[in-house]
Amino acid sequence: MPDRAQRIKGNSRQRTDAHSQLRAALLTAVRELAEQAGGYESVTMRQIAAQVGYAAPVVYEYFPGKRQLLLAVTDVGFAELADRLAEAGCPKRNPRRAEANPLMAVADALWTFATANPCLYQLMHTLVDVPFGTGDTPASALRCFELLKSAVTAAAPDHPAKAQDDDAPTDLFWAQLHGVITLALHGRIKGGHARARSLLDHAATTFRDH
């Protein structure tokens, strides 16, 4: 394992770039290890360091503890999901679904992301003490909500839940999608992934038609 003096060399800009690259590599490493292990609980800082070819103390230079590391992973996960939702809602990139029913487009994006990254998706929605629905909500998670809200508003502008508040229709639709996806990921729904996927399209259609 390289020692501290060997790790980062070069001028200031090169060192900054190297630090950013190593941080990204650590986040990628923990995600890969978690998917292999079936969850984040058993992944250790030592394993993460070994995955990128460093000693464990290097990880602590970037993240004081495992929780801080998982918070960073969660933030990256929501940022990636937001990009997927943005692409799904863009008529130029996804003309058939985005124009016919934007809710189908975002449901498809959410399903694809969750099933490709099951452990990450579950971490994003189960890590404790991550604020949602408050002024302290992470920007990446808030962007996901706003993109989903844009699709809900476009597809169902007069949804009856809006009588409660402007965010209520979005919360309800997200809850439907998340519920079906979570049941599918845990093997708790009849018919497995195939039936769960069709239920998402059904939810998107019925929610629009309310």
Predicted features along the sequence, with ranges:
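Short, flexible, glycine-rich and Lys/Arg-enriched loop motifs at helix boundaries
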Residues: 33-40, 126-137, 192
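Amphipathic C-terminal alpha-helical segment
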Residues: 154, 174-192, 206-210
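Amphipathic alpha-helical packing segments from all-alpha helical-bundle domains
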Residues: 97, 125, 132-158, 167-172, ...
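Helix-turn-helix
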Residues: 25, 36-68, 72
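Amphipathic alpha-helical segments used for helix-helix packing
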Residues: 115-132, 182-190
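N-terminal intrinsically disordered/low-complexity leader segments
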Residues: 1-21, 92, 96
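Hydrophobic alpha-helical connector segments
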Residues: 86-120, 142-145, 162-163, 170-173
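Alpha-helical structural segments
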Residues: 21, 25-32, 51, 68-88, ...
